[in-house]
UniProtKB/Swiss-Prot annotation:
Belongs to the imidazoleglycerol-phosphate dehydratase family. Keywords: Amino-acid biosynthesis, Cytoplasm, Histidine biosynthesis, Lyase. It is an enzyme of class 4 (lyase). The keyword Cytoplasm applies. Pathway: Amino-acid biosynthesis; L-histidine biosynthesis; L-histidine from 5-phospho-alpha-D-ribose 1-diphosphate: step 6/9. InterPro entries: IGPD_sf (IPR038494), ImidazoleglycerolP_deHydtase (IPR000807), ImidazoleglycerP_deHydtase_CS (IPR020565), Ribosomal_Su5_D2-typ_SF (IPR020568). This is Imidazoleglycerol-phosphate dehydratase. Its EC number is 4.2.1.19. The gene is hisB. It comes from Leptospira biflexa serovar Patoc (strain Patoc 1 / ATCC 23582 / Paris). It catalyses: D-erythro-1-(imidazol-4-yl)glycerol 3-phosphate = 3-(imidazol-4-yl)-2-oxopropyl phosphate + H2O. GO terms for biological process: L-histidine biosynthetic process. GO terms for cellular component: cytoplasm. One of its GO terms (molecular function) is imidazoleglycerol-phosphate dehydratase activity.
């Protein structure tokens, strides 16, 4: 497993540079011009103990869609690459997180297959220039490019900010569990197939 990676993604719509360390301490720095997105990403970093340094410029004069989507693509690809053959990791992680009146569960499987499912209230409205529906776009593209199963269930809750924050915090916690090294099986691939994509 690689400890640190720096990758870029540049299109006619976005220019992104990400420094990522899955074995970090939760240190982060963001320069995206999308404050709410930075706030959500900080929860993945902090609660996942993932170091992230992200610089993003996108066509936010139109909207934030391309910026959020392309960040998820790059982050997912880097997670998949950095995990390598996945030897020794727990592979699975799940966390149920309370945040005031909200209760959210996130479960992940880093087994090399994509699946995404969200169950909960509609994510709509805006947070500054960030469209709330982009959270689902981010999660789907992250799961697709990290080649992981990602299930998100918001059991109940009302405050839109709390709902979003609980999702990203629980995602960080679940990823932290899944990428952690199982000291009882640190030289084993966590699959009866003997390999993971």
């Amino acid at each position: 497993m690689l400890r640190n990676m720096v990758e870029s993604r540049k299109t006619s719509e976005t220019d992104i540079r990400l420094d990522l360390n899955l074995r970090g301490s939760g240190v982060y720095a963001f320069d995206t011009e999308i404050p709410f997105f930075e706030h959500m990403l900080s929860h993945i970093a902090k609660h996942g103990l993932i170091d992230m340094d992200l610089k993003l410029r996108g066509d936010i004069g139109i909207d934030c869609h391309h910026s959020v989507e392309d960040t998820a693509i790059l982050l997912g690809q880097m997670i998949h690459t950095q995990l390598g053959d996945k030897k020794g990791i727990f592979r699975y992680g799940n966390f149920t997180l309370p945040m005031d009146e909200v209760l959210t569960t996130v479960a992940v499987d880093l087994g090399g297959r994509f699946y995404f499912k969200y169950t909960g209230p509609a994510l709509d409205g805006k947070f500054g220039i960030y469209d709330a529906e982009l959270t689902l776009e981010f999660l789907q593209k992250l799961a697709l490019n990290a080649k992981m199963n990602l299930h998100v269930v918001v059991h109940y809750g009302e405050n839109r900010h709390h709902i979003h924050e609980s999702i990203f915090k629980a995602l960080g916690k679940a990823l932290r569990q899944a990428i952690a090294i199982d000291t009882s099986a640190k030289d084993q691939i966590p699959s009866t197939k003997g390999m993971l994509e």
